[in-house]
Amino acid sequence: MRLPKLEGKTGSTELNRQFLGYRHVDAPDEGAFYEMENVTSERYPLMAPRSPRAKLYTLQNPGGLCAKTALAWTENGKLYYGGEAVADVSEGEKTFVSMGAWLIVFPDGVRYNTADGTVDAIGQKNVTDGTVNFTLCEADGTAYSDYTVSETEPEDTTKYWLCTGSDPHCLKKYSAATKLWNTIPTTYVMISAAGIGRNLAEGDTVTVSGVLDSVGADLNGEMLLQQAADDAVVVVGFLDETASQTNAVTLERKAPKLDYVVECNNRLWGCSSEENEIYACKLGDATNWNCFAGLATDSYTVSVGSDGPFTGAAVQLGYVLFFKENCLHKVYGSKPSNFQVSMTACEGVQPGSAKSLCMVGSTLYYKADHGVMAYDGSVPESVSAALGGVYYQNAVAGTERGRLYLSMQDAAESWHLFVYDTETGIWCREDAAHAAAFATLNGNAYMLDADGCVWKLTPAE
């Protein structure tokens, strides 16, 4: 019996030599994956499973996470630094800003000094309870105890003359050299009462209110403190005579209500959507936002002309950036007299994605409404074509060793944790982690998830 001759089939082998990551697009390239879970590009060009995470803490009612020389977070109305409770704060979501040794918590305005453990506040409000005394004095607080009050020149030239014949009244001193009464250009008033200067300092700008018209209405308003002690302050002013009152006097060091805050060049910078303004604190002094003495160290305020609320703030290569949905404002200059604010129309930060602003190397990344953008100082460009046409929102970002971690929510309210390798341009999807905040300490990334767990992302110890 003869059998038919069979033709052998030749086999073929396809070898993929390069991993191209996550590409959620029609017909992804060979080496790319439409769906992905727990994959990393750390071993590029090879595909590899991501490193396991290490759970460090489980927090109750956390408000955020950050890092200086140690991890910091808020939990149940307490600020923790390095695992130790260091200050009281309100509950709710927080923004952390580092300025020198200070860690500042917004919107509370509470400051913790990581070097010496000092705790204080940006704002301060003192209201008197009892008698308030007002005394004409010199800049150092020394009272003018011996002077003549009259409309015309007094015969006694050894004393000061409080001239009531001029408008406004003034204080004069006789000069033996010129034989003339010379007006003292600046006079001061000491306001003394129990606790009136508590937690205030020389150089603070405060709002004074409650001074009776019969005492000196001009003492109400914005005042620069020349001297400050717990029970007395000295301000520029004038009195016809020593006076007192029992009505309460209020001294308040105010800070603007800020939507977003960053630190740059030893100043805090913030913005207010309600006022459509940008603010900077006094140089090196986060407690003073209303000091306008014509000095290079002054505070700064400017209104912007763009429409819509601010959606985020960041610092990139020494420049402060304030974002809206369709533009960014960039601050130039080194002091209030030469500060300038420019506007660039572009894809700004998506509302609700302020936490996506993240520096990786010299490039700023953020989530815009139509994708993930990279900004190198010129014009933002999209780097998220691989994510396809899926709409994402509420993005939160962190970084580790040149990689951008980005946790986002899709239109179906499902969460995704993506990782973008900024060196290779490869995207990976790790899992469905819902990040509330990221922090980077000693080159390692940490994540606070929506369940209150703090994770060390990679590698696990």
What are these regions (language model features)?
Residues 1-84, 133-140, 256-330, 408-420, ...:
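N-terminal beta-propeller domains
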Residues 4-11, 123-124, 130, 141, ...:
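Small/polar beta-strand repeat architecture
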Residues 42-51, 77-88, 111-126, 276-301, ...:
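Surface-exposed loop/turn elements that mediate protein-protein interactions on large endomembrane-trafficking
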Residues 52-69, 89-100, 127-136, 254-265, ...:
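Repeated scaffold domains used in trafficking and secretory/extracellular systems
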Residues 70-73, 101-105, 152-174, 203-209, ...:
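Short hydrophobic/aromatic-rich beta-strand motifs
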Residues 77-83, 109-124, 159-185, 215-217, ...:
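Short, surface-exposed terminal/edge motifs of secreted or surface/virion proteins that either
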Residues 86-92, 132-160, 185-186, 387, ...:
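Extracellular/surface-exposed low-complexity repeats and stalk/linker segments enriched in Gly/Pro
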Residues 306-461:
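Beta-sheet-dominated scaffold domains
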